[in-house]
Structures are given as C-alpha cells and as structure tokens.
Amino acid sequence: MTKDYDDDFYRPPMPTVAGLMFPARSKLTVRGFTLAKTPAEKYWRQIISASQAERETCLLTLAMPNLWNLFEQPEPVSFVDVDGKQRTHRFDYLAEFKDRSRVAIAVKPEARVYSLNFRQTLQAIKRDLPMGFADRVVLVTERERHPVEVRNAELLNFFRRRTDRDADLIVRDIIKQLSAEGTIAELVDKSGLGARAFRAVFRAIYDERLSANKRETITRNSIVSPRKDKK
C-alpha cells in the first residue's frame, strides 16, 4: 500500500510565493511558471514568470550548484532615483545561496535597459537597498542567457523531477574511478543503466562532480572529465 510519505505518492506542486501576481490575460505580460524544488524546500513549487526571459533566467539560476532557494517577485524596495524622486522597484528574483549570500536579480531586454537608462537606475536602487535584503544586485539581459545553456538547464530541471538515488550513487562511484576525460556514453555503458545513467550523469555535471561545456548541447557524445575536488 502506498504511504503518503512514499516517493511515488503524488503531491500537487506547492503554489507560488510571488509577492506580485500577474493577470492571466494581459497585453503587457505573458505569465507562465516553472516547477522547481530547491535544496531549501521539501516539495515541488510553482515559480511564476512574466516573460520568456524571466523563465530562462529562472532555469539558469535553478541550475546553479550552490543555489539554496529562489523567490520570484519579492517585496518591492524604495529608492531615490537619479532625479531625486522617491520610487519603488520590485526585482524579478531573489536568490539565496548555500553560503548565505543573497542576490537580487533584475531581468530586462537590452533595448529597454538602454532606453530607460536602467543601469544608472539600478545603481541608485543598489545604493538604497535595505539592510539584509541582498548582498549583490545583478542585471540579466539576453546577452547573459546563452540559448544552449538555457536548453541544458531546462533538461536538468526535467531530469530532477524524478529522483533516482540508486543511479546517482552508481554513477558517482564510476566517476570516482575516472582519471581522464571521456564521453558520457562511456559512463552510461559502464553503468549498465541506460537512460537512467544518462540522467544521473547529467545531474552530476550540474552537481560539479563532472566538468562539461554547458554551452554545447549535452548528449551521449559530450566530453566530460572528473573534478578532483568533488570526488
């Protein structure tokens, strides 16, 4: 009989924790969501995005090995703009990392950054950030989002949906025995687990147990090498 604490027991994803909700029908936003389970949380949760650019940024952030938690649309912050006027700004994401640092993330198209002189505005926002809100402020435009890296991050998020601890441990043992670079196919064949091993190797790359070029599509033919510091 399936227990409610079994891994196979279905649980609907937790709702978004966004501080701002966008209307389902809007000419200004294209609302979507990403299912994610961060190290800080026990269950999968919806992370809302107002644009494809935000969704891509979300996926790339979730793929960071040192990420602890990710919040979308956190509470707005007040600042004095370059004209001396009091204004508020709501960041798109607030990321918490395992070293306890916090990074506020603004996502904007490069053209809008230029037309709004947003980099100067962001400096004013950074200057007036409330104590403890964030240690750093970053701006993400399409220049920072490599399309192949985004696709790899999306595949990683998909592979994380179904945990496979046995495959992860077997692949981890194989990695410990590696002394030189090789293909993912070689690791998969050595494991005898087929697609399960491919998914485990993929996860191991983003756990920084293996090095690989994430700006190339990760396939069975991809070259990987062991990371000595993670063995």
PLM features per residue range, with description:
Residues 1-231:
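Electrostatic, structured charged patches in enzyme active sites and in nucleic-acid/phosphate-binding
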